[in-house]
Amino acid sequence: MDGGARVDGGASQTSRCRHSARMRPPPSHRRPSRSAARPALPERPIDHEGAAALGWTRAALRHALAAGDVVSGGRGVVLGLAGAAPGSPNRRQVERALLDAARASAIRCPRAVISHFPAAVATGMPTVGALSRPCLSVPAGTALRHLVGAHLHRATLPERDLVHAQGDLVTSPARTIMDIAREHGVRAGVVAADYALHEGLVSRGDLADAYEACARWPGRRSARITLLSADGAAESPLESLSRMQFAAAGLPAPLPQAEICSISGEYITRSDFLWDEFGVVGEADGNAKYGPDGRVAVRERETRAKLERAGLIVVQWGWRDLRDFRPVLDRLQLAFARGVRPGSKSRQWGILLPTRLHP
């Protein structure tokens, strides 16, 4: 037998082999390495059975929930994408699940007010980043108790910070923005603030008052940066996040929503970003921009051709580029170096005066 031939190496070798076999579990039972590929995230909210069918174990789900990659609607009912682009159908489904979970938790905690991301969803503001447990706020002095599936915050809740939205008692938009900035960081705070300013949900005065009220609370630095960075000219979360990338990289501040015309006065387009001193246009292309018939795509190509004939360089990017924005920044820097400077005869464009001033 083959086994008999292996025994010739001596009893000690056989003993080591048996010991090694006992210590090493069979391949099917080995713990997966951290670098092992994880099952695909669900394309829509599903229950735990559906997640199991995709290859998710209970342990993997616990880790994903803790990391904010998926969100639970409570009682193991709903799971969904947490990292989808703001405004996308997947993201909206997850946001609705988060709001429903907050509502369910609020029923079990009568003094609680829906706050943070769930309050943003209730008032229509976009969210970015991981969506994990729903957040509720209770008045200062309330004894906190463990509430399964929810994150309770104890804080001052004056009447001016409370509104009703979709039938729920939630924190006001200005208070919600400051809470999000303090809890989830500047990126999430600025995206919500830009939208709220653009849509008239808040004024700069509202944001300033909300900041002053929480100026001594944890996270106040993020809240202050959010207040100073917010710009109601942004028309999408992608524009908000792109603007923050420009600032972090030290790029000159662009002119947002510039109305560009040809030198003869023909209207061309309103650009997302214009660096007029360099002759560069930046276009942040969001989700579902092109219709099935392709007509929008044709118009985009025609507009780009007009901009280029006027002497402008067009740089475009999308949501996927946010994962690593360095290549976009490099393309912009290259365009700045090649662009048409003021006074050049190649400069064949002008800027129309804005008809709408954003707060």
Label every model-predicted segment.
Residues 10, 16, 20-31, 39-42, ...:
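Surface segments flanking catalytic/ligand-binding clefts of nucleic-acid enzymes
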Residues 1-219, 337-359:
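Short gly/ser-rich loop at a beta-strand->alpha-helix junction or flexible surface loop bordering the NTP-binding
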